[in-house]
């Protein structure tokens, strides 16, 4: 039903007739394999669906899930199956402070496993963790640039209500990224990435009713326009500083 509703909503805004089924929220491989198979196949069997994008964690890709993904890829050769894998940062101390309970080593291992079964991976990276410097964030981007991933999503850190990070912010506000430094950081990231790597996202807009900071991020069009403007001003491009 969610899929049908989404197709109707999108078709009303555009002339699209083909869609990507995006299992985004939470961890979409954390369930019994039989159940995962049923919901994935329900999407793949729809003639309008051309790809399946599954968001998950590096510690939720057991052998049974990998086998399922491999089997579905063989069963539906004309449709694409992607995994969106959360790295967030390569710095384990940050991951520990953010309570992700994952490590960069787990992420790299998951990349290896997915590469072996020819499943494309989109790496998800968060920019703006409170304890991270610009150099640390660019180290994460350089790390991703050396991995066999097919795409990347760059996500600005959002501080949201009713979260541990949000509670910390309300008790003792910490610095969050401002618009111009963020846009320039995104461009620095693009320069380090392979020129042929697909960039699926340059920012994000958190739910307005929950967002504590940074409030400028709600104007996504302004953020994207600023990035494009700064690219021209700096006369630079994706891959300019990439070293293979």
Over which residues does each language-model region extend?
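Active-site phosphate/pyrophosphate- and oxyanion-stabilizing loops and adjacent acidic/basic residues
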Residues: 41, 67, 187
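Conserved alpha-helical substructure of the radical SAM core
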Residues: 1-21, 34, 38, 45, ...
């Amino acid at each position: 039903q969610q899929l049908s509703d989404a197709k109707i909503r999108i078709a009303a805004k555009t002339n699209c007739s083909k869609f990507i089924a995006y299992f985004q929220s939470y961890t979409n491989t954390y369930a019994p394999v039989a159940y995962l198979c049923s919901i994935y196949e329900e999407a793949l069997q729809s003639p309008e669906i051309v790809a399946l994008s599954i968001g998950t964690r590096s510690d939720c890709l057991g052998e049974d899930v990998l086998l399922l993904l491999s089997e579905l890829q063989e069963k539906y050769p004309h449709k694409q199956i992607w995994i969106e894998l959360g790295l967030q940062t390569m710095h384990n101390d940050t991951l520990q402070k953010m309570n992700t309970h994952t490590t960069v080593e787990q992420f790299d291992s998951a990349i290896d496993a997915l590469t072996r079964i020819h499943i494309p991976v989109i790496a998800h990276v968060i920019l703006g963790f409170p304890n991270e410097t610009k150099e640390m964030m660019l180290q994460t981007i350089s790390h991703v640039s050396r991995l066999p991933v097919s795409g990347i999503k760059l996500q600005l850190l959002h501080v949201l209500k009713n979260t541990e990070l949000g509670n910390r912010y309300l008790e003792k506000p910490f610095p969050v990224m401002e618009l111009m430094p963020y846009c320039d950081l995104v461009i620095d990231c693009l320069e380090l990435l392979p020129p042929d790597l697909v960039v699926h996202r340059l920012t994000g807009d958190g739910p307005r009713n929950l967002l504590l900071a940074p409030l400028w991020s709600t104007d996504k069009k302004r953020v994207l326009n600023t990035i494009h403007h700064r690219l021209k001003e700096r006369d630079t491009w994706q891959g300019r500083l990439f070293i293979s």
